[in-house]
Amino acid sequence: MQFIDLAEIHVKAGKGGDGIIAFRREKYVPAGGPSGGNGGNGGSVILKAVSNLQTLLDFRYAHVFKAENGQRGGPNNRTGACGADLVIEVPCGTMVWDAETGELLGDLTTPGQTLLVAKGGKGGLGNKHFLSNHQRAPDYALPGLEGEERHLRLELKLLAEVGIIGLPNAGKSTLISVLSAARPKIADYPFTTLVPNLGVVRQPNGDGTVFADIPGLIAGAHTGLGLGHEFLRHIERTRLLLHLIDATAEDVVAAYQTIRDELVAYGHGLGDRPQIVALNKIDALDASQITTLQETLAAYVGQRVFAISAVARQGLEPLLEAVWQELGVSVSH
């Protein structure tokens, strides 16, 4: 399935139904009064967050959404039927902006959360409404009002607690596939992963924590180079970053700093986000090489550096324990 995380749509609420002019025409009532009913209200347009969608793909070709109009009033004081609301489902994590003013209208983060984006027009008043002591036979009614109309920009930011970051080919997709049930495309060349992958990793108590593998980060990603600029927004909501570094890289310190520079340059607090640093692919090195790399990198970053092999499933338990500790999850031994 194609991953689409930006979309623009046009929404229009329904017009209110017109009020009508009518008079009672009954046998034995020679001077029947006004009986024109009010129009029904137009339907509104509502966005609703759902958990079964992961992308804005549905909006790639469908751009215009319109709710039903209200029905006109009827004789005998009958009010017209209201137009049905139009409920548009979006993925959890969708931010909704007014595309013309730039105003943030809402941030739909919870399943079932709704946002009214265009209110239906009010139904017009029938001539019955204008009956008074001074006007016994009003011969006028009001039309229904137009519904609200808006041009919206939808921006999806994935709801993951842990973002796995690193240069292309650091082993991010392999790690998320090993830790969770996610099955991303994996191959030994850069930019295999062209979309963020989500995986649910089980905590010791059985609860799930969402990890996201963020692709395409290279030097200059924040300016649009590589694929990273497209996906950096998806780690804005994370509580923790898991920085994965290829232990077989020519310079692990430079690899670390490249990503670090991109986070700081992108802004939005990513440079200050708590992070865990891990060297991956240690199965390709001997013990002394691993120790040297760990010590060198730990001295540079000023914190512990974990050594793992996602492929060989080495060192994953202490890494996960550190993740749970950082997230405040109880770990029983």
From Swiss-Prot:
The keyword Metal-binding applies. InterPro entries: G_OBG, GTP-bd, GTP-bd_Obg/CgtA, GTP1_OBG_dom, GTP1_OBG_dom_sf, OBG_GTPase, P-loop_NTPase. This is GTPase Obg. The lineage of its organism: Bacteria, Bacillati, Cyanobacteriota, Cyanophyceae, Acaryochloridales. It is an enzyme of class 3 (hydrolase). It holds the Pfam family GTP1_OBG. GO terms for molecular function: GTP binding; GTPase activity; magnesium ion binding. Its main location: cytoplasm. Monomer. The keyword Hydrolase applies. One of its GO terms (cellular component) is cytoplasm. PANTHER family: DEVELOPMENTALLY REGULATED GTP-BINDING PROTEIN-RELATED, MITOCHONDRIAL RIBOSOME-ASSOCIATED GTPASE 2. It is found in: Cytoplasm. Disulfide bonds: none annotated. It comes from the Bacteria. GTP binds at residues 166-173, 191-195, 213-216, 280-283, 309-311. Residues 1-159 form the Obg domain. GO terms for biological process: ribosome biogenesis. An essential GTPase which binds GTP, GDP and possibly (p)ppGpp with moderate affinity, with high nucleotide exchange rates and a fairly low GTP hydrolysis rate. Plays a role in control of the cell cycle, stress response, ribosome biogenesis and in those bacteria that undergo differentiation, in morphogenesis control.
